[in-house]
Amino acid sequence: MPKLKTKSGVKKRFKFTANGKVKHGVAGKRHRLISHNAKYIRQHRRTDVVSSTENRTIKAWAPYGLN
């Protein structure tokens, strides 16, 4: 059986934690930040963890993990 390929979009956008959760960057931080308040900018500063339902899908798209 041939090797499975990892989706290239997953390689660029996600990282796996040590416990197997999936991290992603938060959207809405590229431009036009002057129109958002300080709370929005502060809360979107860090990465976020993907929900458990999407977690299964992303792991299927990266069958051998992300190194």
Swiss-Prot record:
GO biological process entries: translation
A single cellular component GO annotation: ribosome
Family annotation (InterPro entries): Ribosomal_bL35 (IPR001706), Ribosomal_bL35-like (IPR021137), Ribosomal_bL35_CS (IPR018265), Ribosomal_bL35_sf (IPR037229)
One family name in Pfam for this protein: Ribosomal_L35p
UniProt GO molecular function: structural constituent of ribosome
RNA-binding keyword on record: no
Keywords, alphabetical: Ribonucleoprotein, Ribosomal protein
HAMAP family hit by this protein: Ribosomal_bL35 (MF_00514)
Family recorded in the similarity comment: Belongs to the bacterial ribosomal protein bL35 family.
Record-given protein name: Large ribosomal subunit protein bL35
Native source organism of the sequence: Zymomonas mobilis subsp. mobilis (strain ATCC 31821 / ZM4 / CP4)
Lineage: Bacteria, Pseudomonadati, Pseudomonadota, Alphaproteobacteria, Sphingomonadales
